Amino acid sequence: MADAVLFEFLHTEMVAELWAPDPDPGSGGKRRSLSVLEGLGFRVGQALGERLPLETPAFREELDALKFLCRDLWAAMFQKHMDGLRTNHQGTYVLQDNSFPLLVTMGSGPQYLEEAPKFLAFTCGLLCGALHTLGFQSLVTASVASLPACKFQVVIQKS
């Protein structure tokens, strides 16, 4: 439990630091901040993608890799399982978390929906990095319709 709280504090501070007012407003500030958060998440996802599946054989199917993310990776990061996994069987998957830990502490008013994406960028990178390590190129986007629920859309790139 203490690890979860420490991670939440670390994540909040990363977002706050990267979203602090930029003294050079012409440098692409917010877009660059999202890229930095995604990059950090990507690297963490790569490391977890190497370490967590040591007992399991290599994932040959996309669906098996996504199930691994929903169960094992999510439990390692957030001490819970993903609430839903849907697919169109054409390389697009939607992962749903009805109580995403990094959004639970936010208020539920509509004004907070604008702030939510910056709290999801790290996790998008995390999922993308883990999939990369497992051998799947992907594009991950997040959306929030009502707090604290969120959806991550994963599109597997066909080579």
Curated annotation (Swiss-Prot):
It is found in: Golgi apparatus, cis-Golgi network; Endoplasmic reticulum. One of its GO terms (biological process) is COPII vesicle coating. Signal peptide: none annotated. PANTHER family: TRAFFICKING PROTEIN PARTICLE COMPLEX SUBUNIT 6A, TRAFFICKING PROTEIN PARTICLE COMPLEX SUBUNIT 6B. Coiled coil: none annotated. Belongs to the TRAPP small subunits family. BET3 subfamily. The gene is Trappc6a. Ubiquitous, with lowest expression in skeletal muscle and brain and highest in kidney, liver and testis, as well as in cultured melanocytes. Part of the multisubunit transport protein particle (TRAPP) complex. Heterodimer with TRAPPC3. The heterodimer TRAPPC3-TRAPPC6A interacts with TRAPPC2L. Interacts with TRAPPC2L. The modification Phosphoserine is found at S33. Disulfide bonds: none annotated. This is Trafficking protein particle complex subunit 6A. Keywords: Endoplasmic reticulum, ER-Golgi transport, Golgi apparatus, Phosphoprotein, Transport. May play a role in vesicular transport during the biogenesis of melanosomes. GO terms for cellular component: cytoplasm; endoplasmic reticulum; TRAPPIII protein complex. It comes from Mus musculus.
